[in-house]
Amino acid sequence: MEIISGSQIAQEIRQKLKEKNEREGISPCLAMILVGGQKEDLHYVGLKEKAATATGGKSRLLHLPEDTSQQELMAKIAELNQDEQVDGILLQLPLPAALEEQTDEILAAIRPDKDVDGFSLVNRGRMSGDRPGFISCAALACLEVIERFFPSLAGKKAVLVGDSFDLIIPLATIMIKRACQLSVLPSYEPGLASGADILVVEKGRAGIVQAEGLAPGVLIIDAGFYWGAGGVCGNVDRAALERQGFEARLLPVPGGMGPILIAKLMENLAQAARQKR
């Protein structure tokens, strides 16, 4: 089984982007907003700060108290919208429980041309048409891997498992536009992925995906994330696939989607900076 290194792909993307930014003389600025947050949230923000620096850009972190109100948060977003030194704005999710139901409304306050995460309803809506906008970094990360093995999706059979607004829905929209034979499932069942060239599993449970029902040579993208006794794991039982000698290509958890997602965020950030010129 071929294990795909998300870290290696991300490094390639960052290096190319750094060189392009240097040639064009741009140093994009990413403003990140974190409301409250746990240790893991600070870790993810730190990874994005490092990626911005590694690609020739810079970042700001606005760390607000856990009890920040919706009005206070949206006022901070309005300030960043007007700040011409800021090219992209990222709201670290999830928000605290008191703000969680207002997530879409708060995301909508970010100017679409600075919404480098592609999370706002405006950018999500543009996906269904041909208007330019920012695509979710999770969907772009998946597409980056898929295109390395399938430059053309026409006639390929793909199965996506999940219903998320940041991965499954935008990725499905892109794949349909490229004439892919697509099935989107709410949950994973081995028989329903039979014959798939591409399998993306976001929704499920730890280790649910094994060789049963899968075609040899399938590209599997694990987009699950669970904490277990042995650390972080995903939907794919990698050990079982390796024991069985199953022929597949796997983007695993950990070390798969995460690094690529952040690298694609940096590409969106650079695009936002270019559009201001």
UniProtKB/Swiss-Prot annotation:
Print the keywords alphabetically.
Answer: Amino-acid biosynthesis, Histidine biosynthesis, Hydrolase, Methionine biosynthesis, Multifunctional enzyme, NADP, One-carbon metabolism, Oxidoreductase, Purine biosynthesis
Keyword Heme present in the record's keywords: the answer is no
Domain of life the protein comes from: Bacteria
Instruction: Tell me the CDD domains matching this sequence.
Output: NAD_bind_m-THF_DH_Cyclohyd
Identify the residues that bind NADP(+). G162, D163, S164, S187
Report the record's disulfide bonds. none
Q: Which reaction does it catalyse?
A: (6R)-5,10-methylene-5,6,7,8-tetrahydrofolate + NADP(+) = (6R)-5,10-methenyltetrahydrofolate + NADPH; (6R)-5,10-methenyltetrahydrofolate + H2O = (6R)-10-formyltetrahydrofolate + H(+)
What's a Pfam family in this record? Answer: THF_DHG_CYH
Involved pathway(s): One-carbon metabolism; tetrahydrofolate interconversion
Q: Does the keyword Thylakoid apply?
A: no
A GO CC term attached to the entry:
cytosol
Q: Which InterPro entries match?
A: Aminoacid_DH-like_N_sf, NAD(P)-bd_dom_sf, THF_DH/CycHdrlase, THF_DH/CycHdrlase_cat_dom, THF_DH/CycHdrlase_CS, THF_DH/CycHdrlase_NAD-bd_dom
GO molecular function, a single term: methylenetetrahydrofolate dehydrogenase (NADP+) activity
Q: What is its EC number?
A: 1.5.1.5, 3.5.4.9
Subunit comment for this entry? Homodimer.
Which PANTHER family does the UniProt record give? C-1-TETRAHYDROFOLATE SYNTHASE, CYTOPLASMIC, C-1-TETRAHYDROFOLATE SYNTHASE, CYTOPLASMIC-RELATED
The record's comment on protein family reads: Belongs to the tetrahydrofolate dehydrogenase/cyclohydrolase family.
Its function, per the record, reads: Catalyzes the oxidation of 5,10-methylenetetrahydrofolate to 5,10-methenyltetrahydrofolate and then the hydrolysis of 5,10-methenyltetrahydrofolate to 10-formyltetrahydrofolate.
Q: What is this protein called?
A: Bifunctional protein FolD 1
Q: What is the lineage of its organism?
A: Bacteria, Bacillati, Bacillota, Clostridia, Eubacteriales
Gene name of the encoded protein: folD1
